[in-house]
UniProtKB/Swiss-Prot annotation:
Belongs to the universal ribosomal protein uL2 family. HAMAP family: Ribosomal_uL2_A. This is Large ribosomal subunit protein uL2. It comes from Thermococcus gammatolerans (strain DSM 15229 / JCM 11827 / EJ3). Keywords: Ribonucleoprotein, Ribosomal protein, RNA-binding, rRNA-binding. The gene is rpl2.
């Protein structure tokens, strides 16, 4: 018998599960490529802000053409510091320039996957990537996972390390703190296990505190029964 599961409620997109993006500071993207393709823009950091939707602080930068943009703040950035975006930007923390212009061995973050997309890779607090080698038609970068990934030389990146590192070193300790962490992004918390529920609420529920049936389930199972190891090839420890 099918149950009304949490993931079925989540799929309806009610406010219980919707991200409170109206509280977030805004999008963090690079200046459009057509503006800084041939010239370098100079900007000044006006303020450093907490963003509840991110693991890193953001900095508001005012550029010389009068526009203001949010950037991911690098470690060591200061209010009043000048930063540059463009192909002729100096090699310094917080500056953004194409990967073709960044020397090997440099820490970078917020790397574009496609030239002009505004930055897609390495954006979490405390993360950084390493420029490993440069060739005529590609730049090889080591991502935080250790993967070596190829990027086009025109893809832009920011020099430095994303601020906000070490946030996971301090233990949460109290459930109340975990509550506020989840509330900031409207995460569904606490999330009870299926075996702790009543039998009417979950296929694994009931007072016996064991599933009572195989935890593997077909890929074609109806939504109310599709919980556990979905279409698993194998379960348990490998012998």
């Amino acid at each position: 018998m099918g149950k009304s599961l949490i993931q079925q409620r989540r799929g309806k997109g009610t406010t219980t599960f919707r991200a409170p993006s109206h509280r977030y500071r805004g999008a963090v993207k690079y200046v459009p490529l057509n503006i800084v393709k041939e010239k370098t823009l100079r900007g000044v950091v006006e303020e450093i802000l907490h963003d509840p939707g991110r693991t890193a602080p953001v900095a508001r930068v005012k550029f010389e053409d009068g526009t203001k943009k949010l950037i991911l703040a690098p470690e060591g950035v200061l209010v009043g510091q000048e930063i540059y975006i463009g192909p002729e930007a100096p090699i310094a923390i917080g500056n953004t320039l194409p990967l073709a212009k960044i020397p090997e061995g440099t820490y970078v973050y917020n790397i574009e996957g496609v030239p002009g997309d505004g930055g897609k890779y390495v954006r979490a607090g405390g993360t950084y990537a390493l420029v490993v080698s440069r060739e005529r038609d590609k730049v090889i970068v080591q991502l935080p996972s250790g993967e070596l990934k190829q990027f086009k030389p025109e893809c832009r990146a920011t020099i430095g390390v994303v601020a906000g590192g070490g946030r996971l070193e301090k233990p949460i300790v109290k459930a109340g703190k975990a509550y506020y962490i989840a509330k900031a992004r409207n995460r569904f918390w606490p999330k009870p296990r299926g075996v702790k529920m009543n039998a009417v609420n979950h296929p694994h529920g009931g007072k016996e505190h064991h599933i009572g049936r195989p935890s593997t389930v077909s890929r074609r199972a109806p939504p109310g029964r599709k919980v556990g190891h979905i279409a698993a090839r194998r379960t348990g420890r490998r012998k």
